[in-house]
């Protein structure tokens, strides 16, 4: 990590930290006073998005329906498949709570971050103890993909847009509705447990 100057907050972003079992202990050893920001989204949508990313690189030619179950007949969800395993947020959070209190964590709804980024960023700024400077004027909707873009101020040229890369917002494949229902049933108890752990309802159930 880069050094933080006085009066400066440094953010390090590595998505895999949240789901890697040994990381909470190592992070705690680095600093037990830091704050943690976790962006979560509907685990069913997240799994499909993860699959879409892999499929776009042609790393596996099998369909989502073939990958998500242990076999084609049992309808038992394959919890060892990474796109499924990552979405069991309660399991991952349990490891972090062994080292950090909930007060040092802030959970951002991935859905609300897209729908209303200014409100979500206000909560983040408040959590970090910052004077709010990012507001609705810093965002606009990129209609083609439905993702908000950021207007970054430039002293010489004025505000200029910064949008997410082309890898974001890929069109998801059509998934058998019965598979979606099976996944929602699978995640439901884990989602409810996660809601209780963080005292927040994300609306996935």
Residue ranges: model-predicted function:
Residues 1-205:
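Anion-recognition interface
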């Amino acid at each position: 990590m880069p050094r933080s100057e006085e009066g400066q907050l440094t953010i390090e972003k590595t998505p895999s930290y949240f789901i890697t079992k040994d990381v909470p202990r190592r992070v705690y050893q680095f600093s037990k006073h830091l704050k943690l920001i976790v962006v979560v989204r509907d685990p069913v949508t997240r799994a499909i998005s993860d699959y879409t990313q892999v499929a776009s690189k042609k790393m596996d030619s099998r369909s989502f329906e073939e990958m998500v179950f242990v076999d084609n007949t049992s309808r038992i969800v394959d919890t060892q498949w990474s796109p499924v395993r990552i979405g069991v947020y309660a399991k991952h959070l349990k490891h972090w709570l062994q080292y950090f209190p909930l007060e040092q964590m802030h959970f951002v709804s991935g859905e609300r971050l897209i729908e209303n980024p200014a409100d979500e960023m206000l909560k983040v700024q408040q959590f970090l103890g910052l004077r709010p400077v990012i507001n609705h004027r810093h965002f606009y909707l990129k209609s083609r993909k439905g993702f908000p873009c950021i207007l970054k101020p430039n002293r010489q040229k004025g505000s200029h847009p910064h949008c997410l890369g082309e890898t974001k917002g890929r069109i998801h494949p059509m998934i058998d509705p019965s598979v979606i229902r099976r996944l929602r049933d699978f995640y439901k108890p884990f989602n409810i447990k996660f809601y209780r752990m963080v005292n927040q309802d994300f609306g996935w159930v």
